[in-house]
Curated annotation (Swiss-Prot):
It holds the Pfam family PcrB. Mg(2+) binds at residues 15, 42. Its cofactor is Mg(2+). Its EC number is 2.5.1.41. This is Geranylgeranylglyceryl phosphate synthase. Its main location: cytoplasm. Gene3D superfamilies: FMN-linked oxidoreductases. It is an enzyme of class 2 (transferase). Belongs to the GGGP/HepGP synthase family. Group I subfamily. Prenyltransferase that catalyzes the transfer of the geranylgeranyl moiety of geranylgeranyl diphosphate (GGPP) to the C3 hydroxyl of sn-glycerol-1-phosphate (G1P). This reaction is the first ether-bond-formation step in the biosynthesis of archaeal membrane lipids. SUPFAM superfamilies: FMN-linked oxidoreductases (SSF51395).
Length: 235
C-alpha cells in the first residue's frame, strides 16, 4: 500500500506565525484544490499557534499534517493525519539531523509513531531562514544532491525527500537529480512558486510541489493557479 502523499501533486504549507491574506479564511485555503495542508515554520513556532491552525483546518475534508520545528510546537490531536518531521541532511549543526529528534523522544511520551514520518531535507538557498537556522551547507553540486537523496531512501529508509529552496525558485536540474536518484521515495519541492508557470515547471521535476509564502502574501486565488499548474504538469 502506497503512502497517501505518493498521489499528491500540490501541498499548501501554512506558517502559524503568519496571517492569511486580507479577508481570507482557512476555508478559502482548503477550497483551492490542493491535495494537503502542511502546518509549520522555521521560527516562532509554539504549541498554541499550531493548535489554532489545526483546529481551523481539521474540520475540512483535506489531509492535515504538522511539521514541528521543535518539541514545544508539537500538537497531539486525533484530527491530524500525521506528523512530518524534518531532518536536514546537509545541516552544519547536527542538532537538526538527529539532535532535535532525540530531544522530542526524550521529552514527549505520547509520540504516535504510526502517524509520524520523516522528511529528508536538502536545503539549497543559503539566504533562507532555514539555511541560517541549521547552518546548512548549500554549496552542493548535482551529484551531491543526488547522493543525499539516495542516502535518505536507501540508507535511512526515508519515504520523503524534500528539496528546499525557500524564498527563491530553484534549479530544476538539482530537483531532477534528486528525483532520478530515488526509486520509491516521494520528492517534495518547495521554494519560489508564485504562479501557474513556476508550479508547472517544478512539478515536471518533482513529485509534489509545496506552496507557502504565496498563501499568506497573495491568497487563495493565487494558490489556485499553482494548483492548476501542478495538476496540468502531472497529466
Amino acid at each position: 500500500m502506497s503512502a497517501p502523499w505518493a498521489e499528491w501533486d500540490h501541498i499548501v504549507k501554512i506558517d502559524p506565525d503568519k496571517t492569511l491574506a486580507d479577508g481570507e479564511t482557512f476555508q478559502d485555503v482548503c477550497a483551492t484544490g490542493t491535495d494537503a495542508l502542511e502546518i509549520g515554520g522555521t521560527t516562532g513556532m509554539t504549541e498554541e499557534k499550531m493548535a489554532r491552525v489545526v483546529e481551523a483546518t481539521a474540520a475540512h475534508d483535506i489531509p492535515v499534517y504538522i511539521e514541528p520545528s521543535n518539541v514545544g510546537a508539537v500538537v497531539h490531536d486525533e484530527d491530524l493525519d500525521g506528523y512530518f518531521v524534518p531532518t536536514v541532511l546537509n545541516a552544519g549543526d547536527v542538532f537538526w539531523t538527529t539532535g532535535a529528534h532525540k530531544e522530542w523522544v526524550r521529552l514527549d511520551g505520547d509520540i504516535d509513531w504510526d502517524r509520524t514520518f520523516t522528511e529528508a531535507y536538502i536545503v539549497l538557498n543559503p539566504d533562507a531562514s532555514v539555511a541560517d537556522y541549521t547552518e546548512a551547507d548549500c554549496n552542493l553540486d548535482i551529484d551531491e544532491v543526488a547522493a543525499y537523496a539516495e542516502v535518505a531512501e536507501k540508507m535511512f529508509g526515508q519515504e520523503i525527500v524534500y528539496v528546499e529552496y525557500s524564498g527563491m525558485l530553484g534549479d530544476p536540474e538539482m530537483v531532477q537529480a534528486a528525483t532520478d536518484a530515488t526509486e520509491e521515495a516521494t520528492v517534495f519541492y518547495g521554494g519560489g512558486i508564485r504562479d501557474y508557470e513556476s508550479a508547472y515547471t517544478m512539478r515536471q521535476h518533482a513529485d509534489t510541489v509545496i506552496v507557502g509564502d504565496l498563501v499568506h502574501d497573495e491568497g487563495a486565488d493565487a494558490v489556485r493557479e499553482t494548483v492548476d499548474g501542478a495538476k496540468d504538469a502531472a497529466d
